[in-house]
From Swiss-Prot:
The protein's name: Uroporphyrinogen decarboxylase
Transmembrane feature ranges: none
Alphabetized Pfam families for the sequence: URO-D
Binding site for substrate: 25-29, 74, 151, 206, 325
Family, as annotated: Belongs to the uroporphyrinogen decarboxylase family.
Keyword list, A-Z: Cytoplasm, Decarboxylase, Lyase, Porphyrin biosynthesis
Organism: Chlorobium chlorochromatii (strain CaD3)
Subcellular location: Cytoplasm
NCBIfam families recorded: hemE
Amino acid sequence: MLKNDLFLRALKRQPCSRTPIWVMRQAGRYLPEYRAVREKTDFLTLCKTPELATEVTIQPVELVGVDAAIIFSDILVVNEAMGQEVNIIETKGIKLAPPIRSQADIDKLIVPDIDEKLGYVLDALRMTKKELDNRVPLIGFSGAAWTLFTYAVEGGGSKNYAYAKQMMYREPQMAHSLLSKISQTITAYTLKQIEAGADAIQIFDSWASALSEDDYREYALPYIKDTVQAIKAKHPETPVIVFSKDCNTILSDIADTGCDAVGLGWGIDISKARTELNDRVALQGNLDPTVLYGTQERIKIEAGKILKSFGQHNHHSGHVFNLGHGILPDMDPDNLRCLVEFVKEESAKYH
């Protein structure tokens, strides 16, 4: 039995004594303890070494006091498992080779055996689960098909997604064949993560806002829905969070995937999202990460606004406090500790 199951209870919209909190990228460079581990190795080796991935996954639980751990990994391990070479250089960015630009390129990609190609993530999950010893839940995750598609086709990050959009608009069938292959891998991968001990899954669609509403409904949401439905068919008790960054105008469509929670960016008032979705899913978010550059007093004010905006909980509401995107590397860990402690104390009165 979990000693602290608030995160899972909130996702399932069950009564909680207070609002749980965790933070995207909580295992990361803002923590000196993470930097000490990272100095000894490169980023992908850290992801692929279960002992090290476990150590940095647990750091924010012990050092910051968050209510959930998220396995330390990267969304691009999926692209690598499918056959692209991935290089992540923190100062220079991300490179994938070869970029996928033709049907022949797509045909060369595989839907991998997850145990064989991504076994190191599963090992890290099992090891972390053991080390956590039921203190808090453990989150597994994957990038969404659209976001991984953009990296695959562009061969890295992009400002305008020119190659990805060209494929969409010139060769829509080709785009769908690549998205489908990526989606099959994501589904198999997330199911394996649950078997390895993940208590919840988050799907990150980091580049969701690159698409119009109509295109998002065609090229992104169906694949997210496929994964969510596959998880729900096999593991109905495992909550799924969908974080489609800055898609504030189609929250209802995101909820229609069957997910348990919708992650929000900071560009929408959480009360508006709650009203629109009418408590049919839990909400996660949505403090602007740059608030953590502020004074601790200001951090409390801004966090308090979100708690107040979400408002009083009822028997079918759920809120997981988080940032609207990942914590930035140069932030003061004491400011995150301040946020975590404040949310724990202040949120009780809304429950």
